[in-house]
């Protein structure tokens, strides 16, 4: 729109003197000029868009400043959070490894205990099933098993001690599991907060991507603020251009007022039309000036006289500008619409950054609370379980060794009983051999005695009458007789079957000291049980099988 105006001339209206007929026909009608003045006045309402443009620029600049601060704070917190999260998950992994390692070791020890206890119970059951042969016991006594000779109080006490250790370890493990579950709940809560953070970041990234003129998508987890300065610059350019366009509308309005006032009868109309002008605001590029003030000054200013040519030139410019005024108004509206859209994107990015910052601070506060209050408890619970397990593992290992010793003792008892049966059979066999030797010897001694008696009697008959009786007093004595006398064997130290650890080796001197001197048996021969051959063969087979298993 041209800013040309007519030259200043004196006079309040167009003079009639000297006007040519053609010139009068070419002059515009007053109502036409008034319609242009009314349209120019209406176009000045675009000043509201310019005022809104200034508000948008101010709001966008404040949003950009806030985004820079929030983005910097968020980036700083994220770096700290990444380190804390790595440390937190490392602690959780270590605590879980302690739990799994302890659980595995405990399960292995329990399996060993179960195996040892099963072997011991099987041995005890064999003791119950093994009935002592009645030949070993006094006549009339109720049947007894080998288990009747075993004191199980040691087994019961050992089981009680092992149960106490197992219960304590199980309780410590349950406490650790509960602590780990609480730890997992903490991590789940943090994971949910991270999900909120990622959702906000994804939303912000999509908004940032959609607001950019480029078609490429953003993969950043944080919305980029690199596009916001260009947006702000675009808004400032729009605001500046809108101010310039508004100035051109003001100049067009001034020109319309001047033209109407220079037209006969137009002064009063100009004052009537311009009596209720919109409140003006400072226009960019013209800081310190006010549109309303400027218009009022123009309305009240005295008119300078114009020549016909100057007037005609002014009218031509007015008509040309009037044709463009509507386009200028539309351009201002388009620009304010574009600015509103850009501001919406800027504020959306600011809100997204706020959401990310709030999510980040929530995670940071959660981690801070966790690290200062609950995390030390989770770590302490893992250390407590480790300490309890080490203590009870030593006790359980000792109990496992005791179970093995008891099983060995009772297996030795079973083996000794089978050995006793074989020993009885051996002694029976020896006794039979001794009796045979005694019978054979008695028979030979009796033969020798009879032969000696016969020979002595023959000698006495043949030679006795010739020998004086005092030549040898023993000549008439009968031959000596030999008798066998049974002597009881000395008793040896009894064998203790209750505690192999308390048995001590007996030296030869101790054996000699503990052995009683042989005495004549007053109760008859040693009683050797008469065992069935089948029983002896079974005992011998078991001994042989155990010896084979041992190798």
Curated annotation (Swiss-Prot):
Pfam families: ATG17_like. The keyword Translocase does not apply. It comes from the Eukaryota. It is found in: Cytoplasm; Preautophagosomal structure membrane. InterPro entries: Atg17 (IPR007240), ATG17-like_dom (IPR045326). The keyword Ribonucleoprotein does not apply. GO terms for molecular function: molecular adaptor activity; protein kinase activator activity. Residues 1-25, 204-225, 502-524 are annotated as: Disordered. GO terms for cellular component: Atg1/ULK1 kinase complex; phagophore assembly site; phagophore assembly site membrane. Residues 205-225 have a biased composition (Low complexity). Disulfide bonds: none annotated. GO terms for biological process: autophagosome assembly; mitophagy; pexophagy; piecemeal microautophagy of the nucleus. It is a peripheral membrane protein. Keywords: Autophagy, Cytoplasm, Membrane. Belongs to the ATG17 family. Autophagy-specific protein that functions in response to autophagy-inducing signals as a scaffold to recruit other ATG proteins to organize pre-autophagosomal structure (PAS) formation. Modulates the timing and magnitude of the autophagy response, such as the size of the sequestering vesicles. Plays particularly a role in pexophagy and nucleophagy. This is Autophagy-related protein 17. It comes from Aspergillus fumigatus (strain ATCC MYA-4609 / CBS 101355 / FGSC A1100 / Af293). The gene is atg17.
